[in-house]
Amino acid sequence: MNVEFTRSFDRQYAGLPRELQKQTKETIEFFLDYYASRQYPKGLRIHKVGRFLSLTVTMNHRIFVIPIHGGVKFVFVGNHRDAENYLKK
């Protein structure tokens, strides 16, 4: 499976505290383990938001993913307020 990360995602990830980076990495790995089967575990609280899939990292932090040909592209990681602003772009 093709997995891509935008430059903005990489910058956002780099700006997270270490513990949140660890949780984000674990969430991504967990999501990728289940993505092909589309049998998502409830703990990730995956849902559609516009053209994105939204994943829960913590109750206050989200990841946005876009399905692409042959895989997924991670485009955003951040808190709720930043996520709302990202969706307004």
Q: Language-model segments: which ranges?
A:
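Enriched for short, Lys/Arg-rich terminal
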Residues: 2, 7, 11, 15, ...
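A short, surface-exposed loop/turn module that caps and links secondary-structure elements
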Residues: 30-55
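Hydrophobic/aromatic residues within well-ordered alpha-helical segments
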Residues: 5, 20-23
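Short linear functional motifs in flexible/disordered or boundary regions
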Residues: 21, 36, 40, 75-77, ...
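Generic helix-packing signal
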Residues: 28-31, 87
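N-terminal G-site helix/loop of the GST-like fold
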Residues: 26-27, 69
